[in-house]
């Protein structure tokens, strides 16, 4: 039967997963009976009890007991085990919690002290292995204990001098309770200092060895802490209990109380502990919160001054009290011996502060010798404390705003410089305004600050400081983030005043500029002017071509710019060749828009096209960059064009029916901006519009065109809204893809050929050579309306009568000289016509070549009514006179 008992025990241990005693009993070879004896279980337990109680410890043994008895026998030991395990688990939990309180916690302060969470865990293991009741100096328990000690010390240092000085009866129950409690707490603190780890000042190592801690404390602050913690009230309570009350009163009558008062003053040595604890808290606040540390220092300084004044006031009254108020003391002279303690304390405090601030002697000048010496001592201490207070307060206030102080010192030097050179008043005012806008009252050594940081943090700060510039620049929005970061790290902040020339014509270009805030005007030899606003950049063409500037840029308002030197420019673009091609593409487009070209850029661009450097993704990025660069252009009408009218209002009021009547049937494969449309007056209004500064995306509001017909889908779009140009581009791109897939035979039939005017060229429907070159390589047809030598969309004038107009496919260079025609016919007629005009001119390519002839039949002749000679752009002999002027080679 014994052999059968062991398997049953093993099976029961498997059923009871939370119990370890069955397995231990089986492992040691002891039988179930031995286990039952240890647990006090009566024999005869059954198996039913083991099944009913999963957390109980029951063993099945062979015996004559019944099932019910076995079940009852199994329940009794289970209850006894749980009753014993509950307090044990609770005690273990409390012990673990208290032990964790003695270890450094994972918080902001400990992470800053030790560096990482793993280092904090390692320090916790050190505390566990250091010994019993070793307290870590950065533990939570020590933190809260120091807070309690700080409150107790402040209370003692304030209440004890008042009680000793102004209260003669010191045997009252509240006073005894306060002193006994204070002495008890300070004795506990004295004992805990022997078990608290210390910090080695030389190596910043935390010492947790109990022997080393004890020796360090005995050599440092033990004597002072022990004297300040002497339980004086315990001694007097013991003496009072052992002596007869009459004898005790007689002893007091014999002025033993004077000794007790002087002995109680030893508690004021607890000030040393207060200073130590305040210093620790200053370090904690400094490492955790920089601003809070400054506030703590201010309150600490003010509190120490008030505490010294409080002590000095109590001392002023204590000395006459110990002398039983002689007739020549200040208390007797002011007749305040029997006054209330509040009045006595007020006069004493006033007298002490008058001495310490060296402003007088208080209510009564010193007469007795003791008052005289106390007054001199008070003056010396007060003068020293006052000097320390002023020095600390001045340094603290200056440290709170050091950048503004540096700015003031710098500007004082500037004022002395202006006075030394006797600069005029207007120039001094400009210098003053520059410093105000450039530094805004604060000066930082930003270069040294950024150089002291690591690379990721420096890049993050630069990106944050230039976030507004990046948000307003389409070039950065479509660029690689690494390129943007590399570019921003090379920028230098500059400020220009209204009227300052940022760049001058003919100067060698050494910088390019990015406008963060402000408006700048581009000044060229022609009358056309252009405004640059937030997000614009200029001056890059000189850095690419190493040439001289052909235009000047002048600040119209205060401009906050970022400049980039030529060396940094080339350094960044060497690492990002795709962005160099983007700058070159924009430069070619800008030069082409003003009718100029640069052979270096064109040769390099053509070489890239021939070698197939561009891929589809880069083509899309370049298209977006060129598109946004055109939208950033802000043209200003010249003064000598009074016929410039508000085309925006005309096109916005045109009805859809009139727009449908004015559309012409021919479909154009490639179009360009008509210069006659830029300056031709609207039929509805003839009032000239003054020049205005527009937003970067509202170029069409300055030079606005009527509704136009999409050249590939015969759909009408409107240009009146500020974003109309962008909308038309987005609408046109998918339609061009559909047009590309259609056969050439699907185009509408052109009108029959008509005889041409002598001397004029045959109209042709042409495709620009540079655009064709892009198409023959990897560029798609969406690039064609945005090519470097071709404006974005066609423009036409909206009128009430619709007649077809011949399409001119020649370049500006091939426009013939005006010839005499039959009166009333052709464009050379005298009267101003209201017939709609569609004059679509191809520009000459950037390379100077004429686009090829596609063999399109010529259009019918113009109607009888024609425009006057002076208002016709087609008859202008000077093709450059009507070209829009844009900034080039800045």
UniProtKB/Swiss-Prot annotation:
Side Cytoplasmic, residues: 1-142, 195-215, 282-295, 393-890
Short name of one Pfam family: Ion_trans_N
MF terms (GO), sorted A to Z: cAMP binding; identical protein binding; intracellular cAMP-activated cation channel activity involved in regulation of presynaptic membrane potential; intracellularly cAMP-activated cation channel activity; phosphatidylinositol-3,4,5-trisphosphate binding; phosphatidylinositol-4,5-bisphosphate binding; potassium channel activity; voltage-gated monoatomic cation channel activity
Biased composition (Gly residues): 62-77
Comp. bias intervals (Basic and acidic residues): 880-890
Binding site for 3',5'-cyclic AMP: 539-540, 542, 549-550, 590, 593
Polar residues composition-biased segments: 770-780
Tissue expr: Detected in brain, in particular in amygdala and hippocampus, while expression in caudate nucleus, corpus callosum, substantia nigra, subthalamic nucleus and thalamus is very low or not detectable. Detected at very low levels in muscle and pancreas.
Keywords carried by this UniProt record: cAMP, cAMP-binding, Cell membrane, Disease variant, Epilepsy, Glycoprotein, Ion channel, Ion transport, Ligand-gated ion channel, Membrane, Nucleotide-binding, Potassium, Potassium channel, Potassium transport, Sodium, Sodium channel, Sodium transport, Transmembrane, Transmembrane helix, Transport, Voltage-gated channel
Parts of the chain that traverse the membrane: 143-164, 174-194, 216-236, 261-281, 296-318, 372-392
Segments of this protein annotated with the region Disordered: 1-93, 644-692, 725-796, 845-890
Glycan attachment positions: 338
BP terms from Gene Ontology: apical protein localization; cellular response to cAMP; cellular response to interferon-beta; general adaptation syndrome, behavioral process; maternal behavior; negative regulation of action potential; negative regulation of synaptic transmission, glutamatergic; neuronal action potential
Mutation effect (residue 171 to R): In GEFSP10; uncertain significance
Keyword Phosphoprotein recorded: no
Gene Ontology CC: apical dendrite; axon; axon terminus; basolateral plasma membrane; cell surface; dendrite; dendrite membrane; dendritic shaft
Subcellular location, principal: membrane
Record's compositionally biased regions (Pro residues): 854-865
Assembly and oligomerization: Homotetramer. Heterotetramer with HCN2. The potassium channel is composed of a homo- or heterotetrameric complex of pore-forming subunits. Interacts with KCNE2. Interacts with the SH3 domain of CSK.
Disease: Developmental and epileptic encephalopathy 24: A disease characterized by early-onset seizures, intellectual disability of varying degrees, and behavioral disturbances or autistic features in most individuals. Generalized epilepsy with febrile seizures plus 10: An autosomal dominant neurologic disorder with incomplete penetrance, characterized by variable types of seizures including absence, tonic-clonic, febrile, focal, and eyelid myoclonia. Some patients have normal neurologic development. Others have mild-to-moderate intellectual disability or autism spectrum disorder.
Name of protein: Potassium/sodium hyperpolarization-activated cyclic nucleotide-gated channel 1
Lineage: Eukaryota, Metazoa, Chordata, Craniata, Vertebrata
């Amino acid at each position: 039967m014994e052999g059968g008992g062991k398997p049953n025990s093993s099976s029961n241990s498997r059923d009871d997963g939370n119990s370890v005693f069955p397995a231990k009993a089986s492992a040691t070879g002891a039988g179930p009976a031995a286990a039952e004896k240890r647990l006090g279980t009566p024999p005869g337990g059954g198996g039913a009890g083991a099944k009913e109680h999963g957390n109980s410890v029951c063993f099945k043994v062979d015996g004559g007991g019944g099932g019910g008895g076995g079940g009852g026998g199994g329940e009794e030991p289970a209850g006894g085990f749980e009753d014993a395990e509950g307090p044990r688990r609770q005690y273990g939990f409390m012990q673990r919690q208290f032990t964790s309180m003695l270890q450094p916690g994972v918080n902001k302060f400990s992470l800053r002290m030790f560096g990482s969470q793993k280092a904090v865990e390692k320090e916790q293991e050190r505390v566990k292995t250091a010994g019993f009741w070793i307290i870590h100096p950065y533990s939570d328990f020590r933190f809260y204990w120091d807070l309690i000690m700080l409150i107790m010390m402040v209370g003692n240092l304030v209440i004890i001098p008042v009680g000793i000085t102004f209260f003669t009866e010191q045997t009252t129950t509240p006073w005894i309770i306060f002193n006994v409690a204070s002495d008890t707490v300070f004795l506990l603190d004295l004992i805990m200092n022997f078990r608290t780890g210390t910090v080695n000042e030389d190596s910043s190592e935390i010492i947790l060895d109990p022997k080393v801690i004890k020796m360090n404390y005995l050599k440092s602050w033990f004597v002072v802490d022990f004297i300040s913690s002497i339980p004086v009230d315990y001694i007097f309570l013991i003496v009072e209990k052992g002596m007869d009350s009459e004898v005790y009163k007689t002893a007091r009558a014999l002025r033993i109380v004077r000794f007790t008062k002087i002995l109680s003053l030893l508690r004021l040595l607890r000030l040393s502990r207060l200073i130590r604890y305040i210093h620790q808290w200053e370090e904690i606040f400094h490492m955790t919160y920089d601003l809070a540390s400054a506030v703590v220092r201010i309150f600490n300084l003010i509190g120490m001054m008030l505490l010294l004044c409080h002590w000095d006031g109590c001392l002023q009254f204590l000395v006459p009290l110990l002398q039983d108020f002689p007739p020549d003391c200040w208390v007797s002279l002011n007749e305040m011996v029997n006054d209330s303690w509040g009045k006595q304390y007020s006069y004493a405090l006033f007298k002490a502060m008058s001495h310490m601030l060296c402003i007088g002697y208080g209510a009564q000048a010193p007469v007795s010798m003791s008052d005289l010496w106390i007054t001199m001592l008070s003056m010396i201490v007060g003068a020293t404390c006052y000097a320390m207070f002023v020095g600390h307060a001045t340094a603290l206030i200056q440290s709170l705003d050091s950048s503004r102080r540096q700015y003031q010192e710098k500007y004082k030097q500037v004022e002395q410089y202006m006075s030394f050179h006797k600069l005029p008043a207007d120039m001094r005012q400009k210098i003053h305004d520059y410093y105000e806008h450039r530094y805004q009252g604060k000066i930082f050594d930003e270069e040294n600050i950024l150089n002291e940081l690591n690379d990721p943090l420096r890049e993050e700060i630069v990106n944050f400081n230039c976030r507004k510039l990046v948000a307003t620049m389409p070039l950065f929005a479509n660029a690689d983030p690494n390129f943007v970061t590399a570019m921003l790290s090379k920028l230098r902040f500059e400020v220009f005043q209204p009227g300052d020339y940022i760049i001058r014509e003919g100067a060698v270009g050494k910088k390019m500029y990015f406008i963060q805030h402000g408006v700048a005007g581009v000044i060229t030899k022609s009358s056309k002017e252009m405004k640059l606003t937030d997000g614009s950049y200029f001056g890059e063409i000189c850095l690419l071509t190493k040439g001289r500037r052909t235009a000047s840029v002048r600040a119209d308002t205060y401009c906050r710019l970022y400049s980039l030197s030529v060396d940094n420019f080339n350094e960044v673009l060497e690492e990002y060749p795709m962005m160099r091609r983007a700058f070159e593409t924009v430069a070619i487009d800008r030069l082409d828009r003003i009718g100029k070209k640069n052979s270096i850029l064109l040769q390099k661009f053509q070489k890239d096209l021939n070698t197939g450097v561009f891929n589809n993704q880069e083509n899309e990025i370049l298209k977006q960059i060129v598109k946004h660069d055109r939208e950033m252009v802000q043209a200003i009408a010249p003064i000598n064009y009074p016929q410039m009218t508000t085309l925006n209002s005309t096109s916005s009021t045109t009805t859809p029916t009139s727009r449908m009547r004015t559309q012409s049937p021919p479909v154009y494969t490639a179009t360009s901006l008509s210069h006659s449309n830029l300056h031709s007056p609207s039929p509805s209004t003839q009032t000239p519009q003054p020049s205005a500064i527009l937003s970067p995306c509202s170029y069409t509001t300055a030079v606005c065109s009527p509704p136009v017909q999409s050249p590939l889908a015969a759909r009408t779009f409107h240009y009146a809204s500020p974003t109309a140009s962008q909308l038309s581009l987005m609408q046109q791109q998918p339609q061009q893809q559909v047009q590309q897939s259609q056969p050439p035979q699907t185009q509408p039939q052109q009108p029959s050929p008509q005889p041409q005017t002598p001397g004029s060229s045959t109209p042709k429907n042409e495709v620009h050579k540079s655009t064709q070159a892009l198409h023959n390589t990897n560029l798609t047809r969406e690039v064609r309306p945005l090519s470097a030598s071709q404006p974005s969309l066609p423009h036409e004038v909206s009128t009430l009568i619709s007649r077809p107009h011949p399409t001119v496919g020649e370049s500006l260079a091939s426009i013939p000289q005006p010839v005499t025609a039959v009166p009333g016919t052709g464009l050379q007629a005298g009267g101003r016509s209201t017939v709609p005009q569609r004059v679509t001119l191809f520009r000459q390519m950037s390379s100077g070549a004429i686009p090829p002839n596609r063999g399109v039949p010529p259009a019918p002749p113009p109607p009888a009514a024609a425009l006057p000679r002076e208002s016709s752009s087609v008859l202008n002999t000077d093709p450059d006179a009507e070209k829009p002027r844009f900034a080039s080679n800045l």
